[in-house]
Amino acid sequence: MATSSTTPQNLSFVLEGIHQVKFEDRPIPELRDPHDVIVNVKYTGICGSDVHYWEHGAIGHFVVKDPMVLGHESSGVVAKVGSAVTSLKVGDRVAMEPGVPCRRCEPCKAGKYNLCEKMAFAATPPYDGTLAKYYPLPEDFCYKLPENISLQEGALMEPLGVAVHITRQASIKPGESVVVFGAGPVGLLCCAVARAFGASKIIAVDIQKTRLDFAKKYAATAIFEPAKVSAVANADQMREENDLGPGADVVIDASGAEPSVHTGIHVLRPGGTYVQGGMGRNEINFPIMAACTKELTIKGSFRYGSGDYKLAVDLVASGKVNVKDLITGVVEFQEAEQAFKEVKAGKGIKTLIAGVRD
């Protein structure tokens, strides 16, 4: 991996090709709008999408054609403010929402800006990410962190925002039963948000015993490790073990795995709600007969929208959701490539990359 030989001003972690990354000094970003701020990035979490771009150079139709700075799960300190900024000042600690919509299209005006076709999302081609010393954002996409939330925790507002959006899509009511497939960071956070929303039974499902053990200590009320049997058989076993009666009220799939989708549809009660939050293959087989005859409500979930980031911050500030326990490693900026390799190998739950030192 190449490194810059000059004193860096805005050192950035750049993906040039599959498994080809380098540290590159780039210009310090300028304020593009009076309402913008420049953030000195302090911590960035490694997301599965970052690793996927590093591993494959593309996610679906998003293809890395030019060198791209990685990273989008970040927190930092405001370093500069535009002339029209009123809600932030230099020195404020913030969580950084990394996708900026056009604000003018129909989805934006309807409050669903996560569906904006002109979304400029960090580390999604052709837009650079946040693994740099400085990053520009509109002030309203920076969320001031209360004193009881650290900058490390602030970096986890991004995956928590994803989990908040997924869980809000499910419209969970107090006392309901929820099954969450996939005990990675987002699935674990979905369990935590479901608990904060009042779910009485939260069953985490995964094929990795270590993840299930963590889920049980973290936010799940029960865990389930699928056997190598049919989806119907696993669903029946889950219902019986957890006294779900006719089935779960809500299923959240945070895995994207086809067997999870099938089991999730079968474990739901008639009239239940299914939310697909995890992305897997572009196309899978789907149990359409079971979905129709049980008249399920089926929803997708993509990133986060209006109010999700703010709620994420509020949930942590109030103590209703704990994100600190998910942080299993913090590395220096210069160790970013090795950290990507370890995340790819499945080490830890959430690894953070510290910002460039002054």
UniProtKB/Swiss-Prot annotation:
Pathway given in the UniProt record: Carbohydrate degradation; L-arabinose degradation via L-arabinitol; D-xylulose 5-phosphate from L-arabinose (fungal route): step 4/5
GO BP, sorted A to Z: D-xylose metabolic process; L-arabinose catabolic process to xylulose 5-phosphate; sorbitol catabolic process
Catalyzed reactions per annotation: xylitol + NAD(+) = D-xylulose + NADH + H(+)
Annotated binding of NAD(+), by residue: 182-187
GO molecular function terms attached to this record: D-xylulose reductase activity; L-iditol 2-dehydrogenase (NAD+) activity; zinc ion binding
Entry EC number(s): 1.1.1.9
Free-text cofactor note: Binds 1 zinc ion per subunit.
CDD domains: sorbitol_DH (cd05285)
Cofactor(s) in the UniProt record: Zn(2+)
Keyword Ubl conjugation: no
Superkingdom as given in the UniProt entry: Eukaryota
Positions with a binding annotation for Zn(2+): 47, 72-73
Keyword Zinc: yes
Alphabetical UniProt keywords: Carbohydrate metabolism, Metal-binding, NAD, Oxidoreductase, Xylose metabolism, Zinc
Family the entry assigns: Belongs to the zinc-containing alcohol dehydrogenase family.
Role summary: Xylitol dehydrogenase which catalyzes the conversion of xylitol to D-xylulose. Xylose is a major component of hemicelluloses such as xylan. Most fungi utilize D-xylose via three enzymatic reactions, xylose reductase (XR), xylitol dehydrogenase (XDH), and xylulokinase, to form xylulose 5-phosphate, which enters pentose phosphate pathway.
Record PANTHER family: SORBITOL DEHYDROGENASE (PTHR43161:SF9)
Protein name in UniProt: Probable D-xylulose reductase A
Species this protein is from: Aspergillus clavatus (strain ATCC 1007 / CBS 513.65 / DSM 816 / NCTC 3887 / NRRL 1 / QM 1276 / 107)
Lineage: Eukaryota, Fungi, Dikarya, Ascomycota, Pezizomycotina
Gene name for this UniProt entry: xdhA
